[in-house]
């Protein structure tokens, strides 16, 4: 058996095509969704990510609002830009590119963001809404995983999903999505401190690997026919980016989301979805207010 690929690039392209139509409909109402980014410093990797997000915006008609500060920026200077983006009507959603320079209170910066403009879906208010099953921005990578599985017909309803990782971006937040009634999965959360990790993995219908440990998931850990999504990022001895899933897993699993090319494009697409949905919610609220007035 050679696994079929969960193609994030093609699935993300389909999402962008749908967003293009939705953005055009908003523009017809006089509303242009806008993605804001705050980049502090000149880290090449961070700049590459930010530039990629704005290229995605251009593809679907979303406006770009770019804010940059030097790595010498103070806490107060960074917070001033956050307040400006909160108040900017052209910005319907934004992100603060992480990591921020040493000495900056990152949590304080993120908590200052307007939750209604939380494009990453990781503001404490957004995560709280997810716990309470209320409408709000969804965490981009977990939602990207769900959409990627659905697009390829991988059954989530009733599936046993093993998540490996405990970071807020993926590990802690994806069980919240997968256990909603709309997904209806049973989730076991593991991490690098889990005893006998392999015994948990071998029971999984779906594995989401997000520990950041090179080739942590090996072929002998995977149940034949399972779906395996590689979301982990680390570097080998040569500095090359590698994932959490050993290449040999493709000979056991039915489906594999590779890294790169699997979940990554879906994360970027979901960021755009959050920006557009924020604009749609604002438009609906404005229409309701006008009707009531």
UniProtKB/Swiss-Prot annotation:
Coiled-coil ranges (or none): none
BP GO terms, sorted: L-histidine biosynthetic process; methionine biosynthetic process; purine nucleotide biosynthetic process; tetrahydrofolate interconversion
One GO cellular component term: cytosol
EC number of the protein: 1.5.1.5, 3.5.4.9
Binding of NADP(+), residues: 165-167, 192, 233
One GO molecular-function entry: methylenetetrahydrofolate dehydrogenase (NADP+) activity
Family: Belongs to the tetrahydrofolate dehydrogenase/cyclohydrolase family.
Name of this protein: Bifunctional protein FolD
Organism: Streptomyces griseus subsp. griseus (strain JCM 4626 / CBS 651.72 / NBRC 13350 / KCC S-0626 / ISP 5235)
Classification lineage: Bacteria, Bacillati, Actinomycetota, Actinomycetes, Kitasatosporales
